[in-house]
UniProtKB/Swiss-Prot annotation:
Residues 138-170 are annotated as: Disordered. This is High osmolarity signaling protein SHO1. The gene is SHO1. InterPro entries: SH3-like_dom_sf (IPR036028), SH3_domain (IPR001452), Sho1_SH3 (IPR035522). Plasma membrane osmosensor that activates the high osmolarity glycerol (HOG) MAPK signaling pathway in response to high osmolarity. Keywords: Cell membrane, Membrane, SH3 domain, Stress response, Transmembrane, Transmembrane helix. It is a multi-pass membrane protein. Belongs to the SHO1 family. Residues 36-44, 96-103 are extracellular. Residues 1-14, 66-74, 125-284 are cytoplasmic.
């Protein structure tokens, strides 16, 4: 489980700014509502909105401090949207009052609502979106987990299966000595034209042809053209068990040949080629 680190907040200008504004706005709201409560009772719904916003601020602070926004982004968007609705209804009952304490509380809730809107936009956007990429570029520590915590879904290409003869079905091969006088005799029922079209070979020459079939299973040729250029928005460590993957660092520029799948065939500036996850890259 990821641990909370203060450096994640201090090193991220976006997190530091939004969390600081939200905490300050919540304190202003609470103090103003307490002062207003001494003069005139405040509806219970107002206090519920303030308490709910407190939970949102604490939760998002913990998420940003532990750098797990990519894990809880969906939950954050839902909770922040509900908090925005509650805060909006509460604002109307405070800012329309002629009492200064209530108006101050309404101003604090307006700041909280604006912060909720910013959080909804940020956590509701994908990492590939330009605004979020720009915001995350100021926080070098924001790295998504590598292959160890993510399961590859599909590859842009798959190698063809090897055509090999199973050891359980190996035919009996005979020496040429017992076949003396029959080397040039065609096999009964054997048609050379049919064999060439179907790939079926006589048993006598099976050993040589089997080695030929094995030799045909060469590696699939790599693409020769890379018309696209992509920038890495996160660092990625290749899976050592998969020779097709390549590693790259944040902000590294890669050349890409195909962008149709979730795994792209890419080429590094060093000439190294392989597949890279598309959610770690953004097209230029």
């Amino acid at each position: 489980m990821a641990r909370f680190q203060m450096s994640n907040l201090v090193g991220d200008p976006f997190a530091l700014a939004t969390v600081s504004i939200a905490i300050l706005a919540w304190i202003i709201t609470v103090v103003s509502c307490i002062i207003a409560q001494t003069k005139e009772a405040i509806p219970n719904f107002f206090w519920w909105s303030v308490a709910y916003q407190f939970c949102i601020v604490v939760g998002i602070t913990a998420v940003m401090g532990s750098n797990t926004g990519h894990v809880y982004s969906t939950a954050i968007v839902g909770y922040a949207a509900a908090g925005l609705v509650c805060t909006t209804f509460t604002i109307d009952g405070l800012v329309t009052s002629k009492e200064g304490a209530r108006q101050s509380g309404g101003a604090g809730l307006i700041l909280l609502a604006m912060t909720d809107i910013v959080w909804i936009f940020y956590f509701g956007s994908t990492p590939q979106s330009r605004p979020r990429t720009y915001i995350d570029s100021f926080a070098p520590h924001k790295e998504q987990p590598s292959y160890r915590s993510s399961k590859p879904i599909s590859h842009s290409y798959t190698p063809r299966p090897e055509t090999t003869v199973s050891s359980a079905h190996q035919p009996h091969l005979y020496s040429s000595a017992p076949l003396s006088g029959f080397e040039s005799s065609p096999m009964a029922g054997y048609n050379a034209t049919t064999a060439s079209s179907t790939g079926i070979q006589p048993m006598v020459g099976l050993q040589t042809n089997a080695s030929t079939v094995g030799g045909d299973t060469a590696e699939i040729g790599q693409p020769t053209e890379y018309p696209y250029r992509a920038k890495a928005i996160y660092s990625y460590e290749a899976n050592p068990d998969d020779a097709n993957e390549i590693s790259f660092t944040k902000h590294e520029i890669l050349e890409v040949s195909d962008v149709s799948g979730r795994w792209w065939q890419a080429k590094k500036s060093t000439g190294e080629t392989g597949i890279a996850p598309s959610n770690y890259l953004i097209l230029l």
